[in-house]
Amino acid sequence: MDERELIRQMKSGDRASFDQIYEKYHVPLFRSAYLICGNREDAEDVLQDTFVTCWLCIGQLRKEESFRYWIFQIMTQAARKRAKERSRQLPDEDIVNRIDQIAVSSSMEAADEYERTSDKTVLEAALSALDQASREVIVLYYYEEMSVREVAKTLGLFEGTVKSRLYFARRKMKKILQEGVRREK
């Protein structure tokens, strides 16, 4: 059964169709939520909020072929809400400390562990240092492999805005990564 048919059935309250949609989308949505939020707990909350909203609001979806953009839009809105809540709790120093911990490892054991996970961890730390809007664009463009047009549609932005955010986010990440390398030496 194709996705459009699943969505039509889901609109009529079919739980099995919802389960199939969940199976298809929960991994990419969780990955994106994790990269946007920066931690597993928030990503799990965002994922849950995303699918609850999806189930409750599926009737508002006009075009079944727009479902992917629609559900990623719900996820990014939930992530924004969670980040706003979290920003009241966590000082910016925590992000800087996290990058410092990743970039500086003195013992051989820590160095070995760093080697095994360095690329992924350093990129995630650099990503977490970006502002929310830049992080969303980077995650959707690179991790979800959406085109600039698709990212713009998902986030409700102009394509030029997406290109601009990508440009400045890349520059900031490059600077963060270069600073991390300098600290290691």
Regions found by a protein language model. Give the residues of each.
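Short, charged helix-capping/linker segments at alpha-helix termini
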Residues: 11-20, 30-49, 159, 182-185
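Sigma70-family region 2
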Residues: 11-12, 51-66, 85
